[in-house]
């Protein structure tokens, strides 16, 4: 499995590492999930856990018109995956959910 977690509490340079990963993996997927998920599959996890394509402007600073930061430094962490199956499996493992919501970009 090839997943990569980008979390400012775990990596000092998570924001630049995330941007580099997005550039290097244009056909990949990103799980957007809360940093402090306990993996219990609760309503908060269901509400905030989503899978996006790397090309989605809501999770990709390269796709926005203005320079935006804070993709990995706020409440959320990003998990990069090379395939949709890997993204789904990691999202379920991290959140404890049985099903994961997809952004319309997927």
Model feature map: region roles:
Residues 2-106:
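Mature, structured domains enriched in cysteine- and short glycine motifs
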């Amino acid at each position: 499995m090839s997943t990569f977690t980008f979390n400012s509490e775990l990596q000092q340079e998570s924001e630049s590492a995330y941007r580099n990963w997005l550039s290097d993996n244009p056909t990949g997927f990103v799980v957007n999930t809360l940093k402090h998920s306990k993996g219990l599959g609760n309503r908060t996890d269901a509400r905030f856990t989503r899978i996006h394509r790397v090309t989605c402007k809501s999770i990709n600073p390269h796709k926005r018109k203005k320079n935006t930061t804070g993709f990995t430094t706020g409440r959320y962490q990003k998990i990069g995956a090379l395939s949709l199956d890997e993204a789904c499996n990691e999202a379920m493992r991290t959140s404890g959910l049985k099903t994961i919501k997809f952004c319309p970009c997927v």
